[in-house]
């Protein structure tokens, strides 16, 4: 092998070695659900229950929610991009690693189904969720949240099984400007009336 070739091979091997070393911290920083559970049991349990299940209807169900989405919301509570005095106080004490650990804990729980309660709203809720309202430029909710309400990690939350009261409160908050950390949702909610919001909220909680 010529000297120049040996030098080139050596540089390639050195580069590959550097890549491996650079990847090690990322692996070490992987979220730890056990640490998340420890934080949850001391900080989150009062409002969200031990496993993030069906607690008070005013508070969201966290079990089975996408980890990336939960981290985004915690980060935005901490930064003041999403307003809630209680959650800002809780999130402010969390590091980025803490948030990832807590999110991994809740995301690892099995999401449980909910049940729609108002049959009178079923048709209207399904119509908007699956087809939107073209005359008012309202897109189908299923386009972002999925046909079964499973959502898209980081961007759009799981809605299936969520408290109807919580969903209704968030849609109203988007509509009136109390919540503004999602431009798409602000635009959609602004076009929904009270009956449509109630119908959607009740419908999506029963999605499977």
Regions found by a protein language model. Give the residues of each.
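N-terminal secretory signal peptides that target proteins for export/translocation
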Residues: 1-6
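Bacterial N-terminal signal peptides
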Residues: 8-20
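Electrostatic cytochrome c docking/interface patches
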Residues: 22-40, 53-58, 108-134
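The feature marks the first
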Residues: 31-79
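Stable alpha-helical elements in mature extracytoplasmic
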Residues: 32, 40, 66, 73, ...
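Sequence context surrounding c-type heme c attachment/ligation sites in exported
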Residues: 37-45, 64-67, 71, 130-142, ...
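The canonical Cys-X-X-Cys-His
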Residues: 43-50, 102, 138-147, 200
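Axial heme c-ligation environment in periplasmic c-type cytochrome domains
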Residues: 55-61, 76-118, 153-158, 176-208
């Amino acid at each position: 092998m010529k000297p120049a070739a040996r030098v080139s091979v050596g540089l390639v091997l050195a580069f590959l070695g550097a890549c491996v070393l650079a990847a090690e911290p990322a692996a070490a920083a992987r979220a730890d659900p056990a640490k998340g559970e420890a934080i949850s049991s001391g900080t989150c349990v009062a409002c969200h229950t031990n496993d993030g299940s069906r607690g008070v209807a005013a508070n969201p169900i966290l079990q089975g929610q996408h980890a990336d989405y939960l981290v985004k919301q915690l980060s935005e509570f901490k930064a003041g991009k999403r307003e809630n005095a209680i959650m800002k106080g809780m999130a402010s004490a969390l590091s980025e690693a803490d948030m990832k650990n807590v999110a991994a804990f809740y995301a690892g729980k099995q999401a449980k189904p909910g049940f729609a309660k108002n049959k009178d709203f079923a048709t209207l809720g399904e119509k908007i969720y699956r087809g939107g309202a073209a005359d008012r430029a309202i897109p189908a909710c299923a386009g972002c949240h999925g046909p079964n309400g499973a959502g898209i990690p980081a961007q759009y939350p799981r809605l299936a099984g969520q408290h109807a009261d919580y969903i209704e409160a968030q849609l109203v908050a988007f509509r009136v400007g109390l919540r503004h950390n999602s431009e798409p949702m602000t635009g959609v909610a602004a076009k929904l009336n009270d009956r449509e919001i109630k119908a959607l909220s009740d419908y999506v909680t029963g999605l499977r």
